[in-house]
């Protein structure tokens, strides 16, 4: 076996320490001397290269030549190693300038892990720099980034040399500085930096790690290279200080993930009674007993984290696999502190945020953590309220509808706006009555509409309510006895 091939073998990885392997990697001259199709054969065994999934019409990399290499910096200016979008893709995105890869993360809370570090910088400097590079993106979106130190993270960061296992070899100092992999590809979230660069922080006498890292994280989030002036997502490296996003960068990432949530405002709590001071406070009353699910007309219903939640008068019923969970019904404030009572409607969006509506206001939670609210419904483009029901529709949770009386609106969480303040007629939903109280979608794609103690099941294929409905909510969802009188 040739020495270069042995260095990339499993035996070498087992016998030699990782840092020694880095030092023994073949230099650019040996890499160029490999057979022209060697890395293409490897790519065929593993499938298409990761960026091909996002850019079907990207040109194939030029085959290696036998020409003795010159220093990379004399061949071309330093740049990102992610291939530029094809002409066709650029033309389709020319009006909006920023270019998308075709993928995005379907969540907003992401983790990252640093596997290896550059030799020029201490580890704590690198950690702070990576956090700062991610912060330029989280400042303009709802995204959050948390470092982890073991296991698989969403974003895996590494410093490597030459051939390093992804068919996109580095070329030594200068030239290609780093590359990253888009969402929805087989190596999504991987970010690789060339170990042989002279990495610095805030210094133009080398390669600024902060700027390069922020650029690569843009790829990880789904952005391609752009030709917009002074954009961070430009393919070519130019030292700029301080680091900032251009308007084009902001528009691109907000097109994918939306704008950041407004800061939650909290009222300063009044001081409690102090010792030795008489007060006229009345002790808080114990909450009323929960309503009977067999007789209740529910305020809202929503599928949250794959489970079904029924809301009524400040209480919540939690069903998993069709079974009411122990400890329920319980106060809804047990899960969502500060949630008003009662709620008019609720839904979970594709990013896992849970929206609640009451009157002319709405609230948003990330799990059980409040991130927004109360906020006016007019921010969403609604001029009529309250919202009586909210329905998440479609396999990707990308269609959300608000219902009120005989009207409905389509809502986009990414922009936080309805299509139009002018509603459509609810008669579009054939066989479903007007004035519904709640709505939700099950795992099979069927929609359910509740009014009073009855519900209608809606077929997504025939686009109409199924025969045999309405039926009673109590017996079908809570195992209640069927009433003797069938005339409801």
Curated annotation (Swiss-Prot):
Its cofactor is Ca(2+); Zn(2+). GO terms for molecular function: metalloendopeptidase activity; serine-type endopeptidase activity; zinc ion binding. It comes from Homo sapiens. Residues 41-93 are annotated as: Disordered. Belongs to the peptidase M10A family. Residues 32-97 form a propeptide. Binds 1 Ca(2+) ion per subunit. The conserved cysteine present in the cysteine-switch motif binds the catalytic zinc ion, thus inhibiting the enzyme. The dissociation of the cysteine from the zinc ion upon the activation-peptide release activates the enzyme. InterPro entries: Hemopexin-like_dom (IPR000585), Hemopexin-like_dom_sf (IPR036375), Hemopexin-like_repeat (IPR018487), Hemopexin_CS (IPR018486), M10A_MMP (IPR033739), MetalloPept_cat_dom_sf (IPR024079), Pept_M10_metallopeptidase (IPR001818), Pept_M10A (IPR021190). This is Stromelysin-3. Residues 50-79 have a biased composition (Low complexity). Zn(2+) 2 binds at residues 80, 215, 219, 225. The active site is at residue 216.
